[in-house]
Amino acid sequence: IPLSQHQVLYHKKQLSSTENGVNDFKFSPDEKKVIVIHSVKYGKRAVDSYPDLDKTTGRVINDAMYRHWDEWVEEIPQPFIYDFDGKTLSTHSVNILGDEPFECPMKPFGGIEQLAWSNDSKQIAYTCRKKTGLAYTASTDSDIYLYDLESGTTTNLCKPADYIAPEFDITRSLKDQAVNAFIKEGKDYNVGYDTNPQFSPDGKYIAWQSMERDGYESDRNRLCIYELATGNKFYVTELFQSNIDNYCWAKDSNTLFFVGTWHATTHVFATNLKGQIKRITDGQ
């Protein structure tokens, strides 16, 4: 078909045919695999426990976090890996979370930005708050995990392997919870929201947005950098006393650009790995 200048011919073709539909997706850099977010069944409805009451709308609730704003929690999003041959998705898939009953991406606002492919397509960094019930309701302690496709193993990048989360004490305020005492002790266990990982272009680092304290949904969002070779973590926006609303790596892997608001004006800033910050945009 002859096309005039600036015209593009699109050919639409269905690539997937999955029973659960597709909530979101992200192709690997080599385009041989794809992450697909499916909704999977979570918990039991009354009719599941009492099949003879197939018309019941009642619910048996014995734990917290049974509802998100305008919807009952009957399904949760989870990431599945499919092979892709350039034409269609494979019929077989692997759930990154295995049998774990957790959300990924996290509700209510999380999307595909909470998962990232490594540059060599061999690993996936993902965001997850691995809690249920009351602990899920009261805590904002999500972490960044690294999943290796070849071995099927998962590593928590935020906490040591022997970390055990303290029990939530309903008689204490959020500030006085044992989990937040780690901060006073100088232990950086990333006990607040940790979200939206991104690999550096050279593959040496993973960055993510990080809140310091557990239970504080409006805590300051910082940029945390994780060095894959050493396991060291450090923060590069400590001199910026406001939120990191969004960010991306520069091609040199030594600079990150981020969007932040200062004095009621939103601008683009840049920081290097030493935490030296400069404003890129000006005006209002």
Regions flagged by a language model, labelled:
Residues 2-4, 77-85, 141-151, 222-229, ...:
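Beta-propeller blade signature
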Residues 39-99, 127-130, 134-145, 173-178, ...:
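Predominantly five- to eight-bladed beta-propeller fold
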